[in-house]
Amino acid sequence: MIKPLIRPGITFLKSTSEYQWLLPKKSFFNFEKDVYTCMCISHIPPEGSTYGINVLESIENDVILYRDKGHIILCGDMNARTRCEKDYIENDSNDGINVYDNYSPDFSISDWVNEDKTLCDRGKQLLDMCISYRMRIVNGRTVGDSTGKFTCYMYNGNSTIDYFIFSECLFNDILSFHVNDVFPKLSDHSKISLRLAASVNLVENKVQMTEFPCNFIWKKDSEESYKKAFQSDLIKDKIKNLCIDIETPDIDT
């Protein structure tokens, strides 16, 4: 799942059957802060399910734990329909009202668009979490997804339930976001992909590589040359020495 090239820069954190927390280290990717990333790796049970755990609530508790240590990214199938409701406090300001001295108003950000016009209770819960912890939905808001494409295609209708959600401070580092074409034979969900600006510190490979011999081009007279080569004393001696090496056990004494 993680390319070997960047694996040294990734730390695995909390894991459940529904999601996996990862930590891409700031020292490896040259981020301003560590980026705590939650990947929803399985389908979150729908509303009304008898499954006893509120997965979004569990993720929110983790966000509370990690948010003061770095930035947050959530991604994957949230099974939450959010229409295109606000995920930030509109016209937020600390002017003219009594607020804490260290209060910082929400960043000004463009509204997002969404082909899905339905809002469900879990969608409201997800939006509340975004507002509470200054996280913003990437879908329908960046280069690559100007229309807010559906991400799930079912027999009873299409929906947008797969997301990338970023700490608002990270938004300027997003290069593009894409909802890829769906392949019904593989999944009823579209793959979502995102490009994030980073500068990876790669360790130079100092292993001495053996030079590979040049390719031999076979010609009409090559067969005869091949036979003559095996008749030469030089080649006979090399083959003899090789056979001796193979038959002699390598034992330390």
Regions found by a protein language model. Name each.
Residues 55-161, 166, 233, 237-240, ...:
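Metal-dependent phosphoesterases centered on the DNase I-like endonuclease/exonuclease/phosphatase
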Residues 12-15, 51-55, 85-89, 177-179, ...:
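Short coil/turn segments at secondary-structure boundaries
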Residues 9-13, 23-29, 62-65, 127, ...:
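Beta-strand elements of modular eukaryotic interaction domains
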Residues 23-37, 73-74, 96-97, 156-253:
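Surface polyanion/phosphate-binding segment centered on an Asp-His-Pro turn
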Residues 42-44, 77-78:
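Active-site metal-binding loops of divalent metal-dependent hydrolases
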